[in-house]
Amino acid sequence: MNAITSAPAERLVRVPLGERAYDILIGPGLIARAGAEIATRLKGRKAAVITDENVAPIYLDALTASLKAAGIQSSSLVLPAGEKTKSFEHLMTVCDAVLTARIERNDAVIALGGGVIGDLSGFAAGIVRRGVRFVQVPTSLLSQVDSSVGGKTGINTHHGKNLVGVFHQPDLVLADTDVLNTLSQREFRAGYAEVAKYGLIDKPDFFAWLEANWQDVFSGGAARIEAIAASCQAKSDVVVADERENGPRALLNLGHTFGHALEAATAYDSRRLVHGEGVAIGMVLAHEFSSRLNLASPDDAKRVDAHLKTVGLPTRMGDIPGELPPAEVLMDAIAQDKKVKSGQLTFILTRGIGQSFVADDVPSSEVLSFLKEKHPQ
């Protein structure tokens, strides 16, 4: 990829899943146009908007006004913000709101928020009336480049993260890049971890481009739109090849096995660790573990660590505030990972930058020894 110098321009990424194909629109001003974009694609004229207490005061009125202008009747539900909202209790609250609004199969549930709202709303949309239409309006960088695309929905339980859910593809994704201007630096950095992930999976040129252009991505404009579009295209390619995560789609979990265990270890307390930060630490650990297994050069892990550290992300377990439980407890969380098959641990490892692969024969003893070595005791 070359340096981006042109003015911001809207981008469209098509996810070609046959009859369930959908568009991802990326650019400024999309919330104001949401009603028109939805009306041209969906037959229904009712929508239930699900959002949270942080997003609602900023964007809910603009979205509902846009829906009204397009002739779409809407209701809204405002939920508490944070990872703990991804629960059975709140899932039932969303389902009740959707049914109370008499949303039918051709009508839509609209997720206005970050990954938590998208995952929760998508789950409800997938099970109410055995499936209603679903529109994602992601308001964080992380949700724009990752969780809003691909149809994975779910909630957390005390057993772990995202262990209960369904696949339910959206009918449209509206990634309004203007909303990113209201994110805190911490939130934006957390989303950037998922952007970098796509380069580390199988696009080394993209990772190198990010190393050279990350400041322009952070400052906005054309480079930001280009990075989001490239990320969405990368995810679309993987989803189309393996929609149900039976094979190569597991690559999208690079850094997530370690990251999810760290999130569980912090009780999903966003004051200590948010998802993207867990992924950043997890990606560094995945590269270091690959080096430990003589699969990759230690220089690759150092390069990943250096870039993520440069943009301000945590890269070590010791960067997480407060005490962590022992390595054995982290190991228990890893054993609950949804990629575990027949009791065998499955990790996304790497042979170098952009050379990730699925390893389903990783010895538990090696993982535990590695965690003990990296644990900030």
From Swiss-Prot:
GO terms for cellular component: cytoplasm. Disulfide bonds: none annotated. Gene3D superfamilies: 3.40.50.1970, Dehydroquinate synthase-like - alpha domain. Its cofactor is Co(2+); Zn(2+); NAD(+). The keyword Zinc applies. Keywords: Amino-acid biosynthesis, Aromatic amino acid biosynthesis, Cobalt, Cytoplasm, Lyase, Metal-binding, NAD, Nucleotide-binding, Zinc. Its main location: cytoplasm. It holds the Pfam family DHQS_C. GO terms for molecular function: 3-dehydroquinate synthase activity; metal ion binding; nucleotide binding. It comes from the Bacteria. Catalyzes the conversion of 3-deoxy-D-arabino-heptulosonate 7-phosphate (DAHP) to dehydroquinate (DHQ). PANTHER family: 3-DEHYDROQUINATE SYNTHASE (PTHR43622), 3-DEHYDROQUINATE SYNTHASE, CHLOROPLASTIC (PTHR43622:SF7). This is 3-dehydroquinate synthase. It comes from Rhizobium rhizogenes (strain K84 / ATCC BAA-868). The lineage of its organism: Bacteria, Pseudomonadati, Pseudomonadota, Alphaproteobacteria, Hyphomicrobiales. The gene is aroB.
